[in-house]
Every structure is written in C-alpha cells, then in structure tokens.
C-alpha cells in the first residue's frame, strides 16, 4: 500500500529506534506533528510493538507541546468549595476587627451585610430537617449588627439584667445540643460595683429549649439564668436568678424568640434575627 510504504520511509531502521527510547529520532518527532489522525492509526501495521511505543511516546510529546488539551473545568463541588472558602475569608476579614460589632460604623455594617449575603447566596438555602446536627457544638459570636446600635435586634428571652445594673459584655457563645434540644446563650460579663469595690466578673448562662420550625427557623424558649462568678469570687458555687413572673415581664421580653439559619457549615454559622439582626458565629 502507498500509505504504508510512505510511512515506513519516514521511520529509521529498527535497531536505531530500539537503541534509544528516551530521544526518538527527529524524523519521527516532526513528521507526526501536523497529522490529525488518531495516534495509533498507522503504527500497528509496520512497526514492531516496542518501536510502536517509542513512536507513540514521541507523538504524545509533539501533541502536548503543540496543541494541548484544555484544562479540566473548575465547575462543580470543587469550584463551589473554593468559592465558599474565599467568601468566608472575606466575611471574616470584614467583621474580625469590629469587636463583635460594638465599634462598627455605618460603612462597616454595609460591608458586613454585603459579604454575608454573598456567602448566603453561594451556600444556597439551608435545610436542617435532615441535618440538624450541623448546629451541634459550642459557637462563638464573632459579629452582631445589633451591637453597633446598642440594640439586641429582636426579642431576647431572659432576665433584663442590663436594665438593672451596669454590665460590660465579654465573649458570647451559643451552646447547642441537638439531642436534648438545649440551647444556651453564654455571656462573659463584668458587673459594675460601687467604689471602692472591684467589678464582679461572672459567666451568665441563659438556658433555653429550642425547636425547628420549617426548614431553617429556630424557636427558643427561655427557662432560667445561671450565674457563675470568677476571679476573686470563683469559689462561690453557681446560682440561678429567679425568673420574673409573667405580669412583671416587659412586652419586649415574652420568654421566646426565633431566628433563621441562613448559612451553616462545620466552622461557620450565619443567622438572621426576628428583626433582621445579622449574626456571625464560628465554632469554638
């Protein structure tokens, strides 16, 4: 056949080809580069198996060096994971220096809102009906949009301690047990005292029970407040603060509250309060 003889004329003698697989002869390397036929189409009939491998090897080299295949697409879960990781870092960089929102300006609030919405959109709708265990654990409050306005951004069940005595707020946590349905708001506080007494350091735990409403709304019901002193008074055992009777409880503090979980993964959680308060938590 003409095609076979033409192809054979391009190949060197078998001994020369078999003697050096690492550097195929130039005639093979350049004669195959313009061909568009399959790599194995013309080798099997005239070249022994070992020479066929050597020729195929040089053909692959030419193909990669000349017209390379397109890189694999980054779409799918891998690309989504990278995008979400970048958006999480963006949100953290926006809110990390705001002292949980206490020193946030109007511009800071807007930047935090935009960064949170981008992450919420990328994460998609939250459905906790089969994944309630995503809430399990102790979460540290990193940011609250309500703190900048000195508002708590919605109804807050529990004792209105801040109205009775001056309180300086420290770290705030949420401890959630999806099995017992316990939902504890834990706040490190410093209670003011008249001079010359030092302020009282304590940890207040507002115990609740929670239930899931729909796919992502959490309703909490207040049960009790427990205080554990620290510092010089750490030897005092924990004690409960009596719950106010319903007749004395202000209308803004009905004993229940709710919020929506708008984003959650293994390390971060975003919630929206019943008055739109944005909160960002990280796993403790």
UniProtKB/Swiss-Prot annotation:
Compositionally biased region (Low complexity): 1-11
Localisation: Plastid, Chloroplast, Plastoglobule
Domain of life of the source: Eukaryota
Keywords: Chloroplast, Phosphoprotein, Plastid, Transit peptide
Transit peptide segment: 1-72
Cellular-component GO terms for this entry: chloroplast; chloroplast envelope; chloroplast thylakoid; chloroplast thylakoid membrane; cytosol; nucleus; plasma membrane; plastoglobule
InterPro entries: PAP, PAP/fibrillin_dom
Annotated positions of the Phosphoserine modification: 96, 105, 148, 151, 155
Statement: the UniProt record of this protein carries the keyword Plastid: yes
Gene Ontology biological process terms in this record: chloroplast organization; defense response to bacterium; response to ozone
Signal peptide: none
PTM per Swiss-Prot/TrEMBL: Phosphorylated as part of a basal defense response.
Summary of the function given for this chain in its UniProt record: Required for plastoglobule development and resistance to multiple stresses. Regulates plastoglobule osmiophilic content. May be involved in the transport of lipophilic antioxidants in and out of the plastoglobule.
Subunit annotation: Part of the Photosystem II light-harvesting complex (LHCII).
Family of this protein: Belongs to the PAP/fibrillin family.
Name the record gives this protein: Plastid-lipid-associated protein 6, chloroplastic
Gene coding for it: PAP6
